[in-house]
Amino acid sequence: MAKEIKDNRILSVIHPICCGLDVHKGKISACLITTDNAGKEQYEIREVGTFTDELTELREWLLANNCPIVAMESTGIYWRPVHNILEGYLEVILVNARHVKNVPGRKTDIEDSRWLAGLLRVGLVRGSFIPEKEIRHWRELGRSRKKYSQSLGDYKRRVHKVFETANIKIDTVVSDLFGVTGRNLIELLCTEEAEISIEKIEQCAKGSLRSKVAELHRSIQGFFEEHHRFLIMSLMRMIAIIETEMALISERMKGLMRSYEETLERLDAVPGINEVSAQYVLSELGPTLKDFANSGALASWAGLCPGNNESAGKRKSGKSPVRKHVLKAIMIEIAWAAVKTKRTYYRDKYYRLRSRLGPRKAIVAIAHRILKALFAIIKHGESYRELGEDYLTNKNKKSRVSILRKQAKKLGYDLVPATPT
């Protein structure tokens, strides 16, 4: 007869030796947990600084105690110096601070490290995605370019503002003030102090704007004084600097991603994606997606899928989590570009969803679908296949006909197929 054995342990120990780190800018509290032969845990606390030599001492202490794994909160960028020292020597688990909150009333640095170590010991922490070093370099370049792009937009808006205050209305005639014609006119305004003749306007106008020379001439008749000239020249110099830096970063990224040109080309074939956004996507995800089991896991990580919120058997609001995720912002931009591309599946699907969900939820749904396609392209090497704007119409034709028959019957009519002529 089998003998019943009572197990008094509430949770199984996953990591008998582990460490929790409470990381700050200038100080780290470390709690090392070890387990003796009797299965009893022992705690050792240390506080160290964040200079490289101090972090190296921390690493050597952990290795001397045969610690294979550490956990720390993703506090700003303060975890990066620690990760730089420990990477390649120990397994580093980066956890979301919201997921490992300590018990109220026990909030000290040492207690936080002990709490984190305790959670790690029994496997109650979930690590964040930390890409490889090469991919992290791509990320930093891509995010720097994104910041430059945002700054560029700010400076361009300031140019528009200065022109508006000076009664200069070029942007009412020219769709892009910073296109060839627009820049020519800006340069003309900044270099010509005398009254500008219509002949000089003709020299500035390019393409279809040559037929609007008279309107362009009227648009610059304002109160453009030396004060406005100085401001515009200052702003244009900053715009030129930012554009140069963005071009240098793009070339740098292109060189680093040269081994993955084929993947970038396949990404570029997706509606809404160009060369730059393809680089953004690859820099955020990496070229293998080995850390994501399926497209659903990727969408969840990016904050582009509904959350689970169920209580007492009832499903409550499952809206996407409010998360400032870089990839989510990129995918939303791609989705907007995709739905503006005519005769595509995404455009048709967006307008179908918008009538039911509204524009904001609909665009998130499109971003989710595009991300699933990108998963297949990157991980499985598949090529994008455009379904076309009639895909859903043809797919739902039978059900649509059935609905129309019922509607016609209610109105006292019979729906019959059209006779071929």
Segments (PLM) and residue ranges:
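A detector of single, family-specific signature residues
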Residues: 1-421
